[in-house]
Amino acid sequence: KLIGNNEKKIPEDKLSVLMDSFVARFSDFPDTITMASGARSCYNEAFHISERDIAGKPDRLLLQWVDAEYTLFQKMEEKVYSPLFHRNFSNVSEFTETANQILNRRKSRAGKSLEHHLASVFDASHIVYEEQVITEDNKKPDFIFPDGRCYHNFDFPADLLISLAAKTTCKDRWRQVISEADRIPEKHLFTLQQAISKNQLKEMKDSHVHLVVPQKYITTYPEKYRND
């Protein structure tokens, strides 16, 4: 039997319906954890994703969740900002201020949402971790493995501790990771940024920062650093 285009689109159509239903529940933007959880829930239901699927294909599903959340966020923007579409701005400053508020909301949401999606992967994989553990000088790494109690217990071997930061892009902010957990000399940084330059990768390596990226992005990096 030949499968028509309409049948192929059933999961995508269901995803759109689920997202519309989610958006209808809110009059304003929900917090990031609610938005991230909603995107995952919509995607997992539409495509019949199980916990076993998440544990088995975390790289692929993480990226699909990120894409799904961006689509969901756009739908929420359409609802919340629709009154502005026909508004007459009195001057350029008023217009740019409004535009900047919209863009800044997007930027501030992205990083925290990535943390929520990573946590969901760890949960599905039954990995023990703790978020936002307070370390030296009130620093707060995004994730400590196994947890803060082990980190602060100096009888617990330091080589069994892992620190992971999550940043959608690295740029200069990756340096924040270096001082976030003194007991852990080798830091890990998860990012969605592709094609980082050789110079920046060398600087990261020299600073004992190890990148963690989705598998499909590895080929965008210089071959010399793909196995680091």
What is the predicted function of each stretch?
Residues L2-K9, T34, Y43-I54, P58, ...:
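Proteins with a high burden of low-complexity, intrinsically disordered sequence enriched in S/T/G/P/A and R
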Residues V23-K112:
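Interdomain/boundary linker segments immediately adjacent to catalytic/signaling cores
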Residues N5-N6, N44, N88-N91, N100, ...:
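Detector for Asparagine
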Residues H116-A119, D123-A124, Y129-D228:
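Catalytic core segments in nucleotide and nucleic-acid processing enzymes
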Residues K1-S37:
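Terminal, charged accessory segments of proteins
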Residues P11-K14, R25, F29-D31, S50, ...:
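Serine/threonine-rich low-complexity intrinsically disordered regions
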